[in-house]
Design a protein with these regions (language model features):
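Hydrophobic, membrane-interfacing alpha helices
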Residues: 1-168
């Protein structure tokens, strides 16, 4: 979480002009983004399993856009711009969460038949996030196709997870 928040600070500081933010707002938004993200994964896990101790990364994927919408309305900024700038923050934080899955030993893939080795589903998801960050960050910086960043992420993530779930 700390690593994700630090990334958010650096990324949002670079992008503060697009969202017309003061430097201190970058710090507040970075911490809020992480806190809302944690609440999102906890709430979604509770809705899925009834257990508040679990986490589900789908919470971040599905609830964060609602938080972005609320933030855009409260600060009178275009929703598409808020989504474009904050999507890399969400991607990086989700990537850190998957790294935590490796460290804690959860979310491993199915055992490969005839071996004791698991399919590297967590590792593939981390690789997916790295590739998406490499592809999306330049698009956000150049404001290429405004408003397309989050939908592009969702479409690719949906396709990735559809395939990944066969091995989870």
């Amino acid at each position: 979480l700390l690593l994700g928040t630090i990334f958010n600070v650096f990324w949002l500081y670079r992008m503060r002009r697009q969202l017309q933010m003061k430097w201190y707002a970058v710090l507040i938004l970075s911490v809020l983004h992480t806190a809302i993200g944690v609440c999102s994964v906890k709430v979604f896990a509770f809705l899925e399993s009834g257990d508040i101790g679990n986490m589900s990364l789908f919470g971040g994927v599905f609830f964060m856009p609602a938080a972005y919408w609320l933030g855009a309305k409260l600060t009178k900024r275009p929703y598409w711009k808020v989504c474009d700038v904050l999507t890399p923050c969400m991607l990086f934080t989700l990537m850190c969460a998957r790294i935590n899955c490796i460290v804690s030993g959860c979310c491993s893939g199915l055992v490969i038949p005839g071996t004791h080795v698991h399919f590297p589903t967590r590792e593939l998801e981390i690789l997916y996030y790295i590739v998406m960050l490499i592809l999306l960050i330049p698009r956000v910086k150049k404001s290429k196709n405004p408003g397309s960043i989050y939908p592009l992420y969702m479409a690719s993530y949906g396709a990735f997870r559809f395939l990944d779930e066969f091995f989870r």
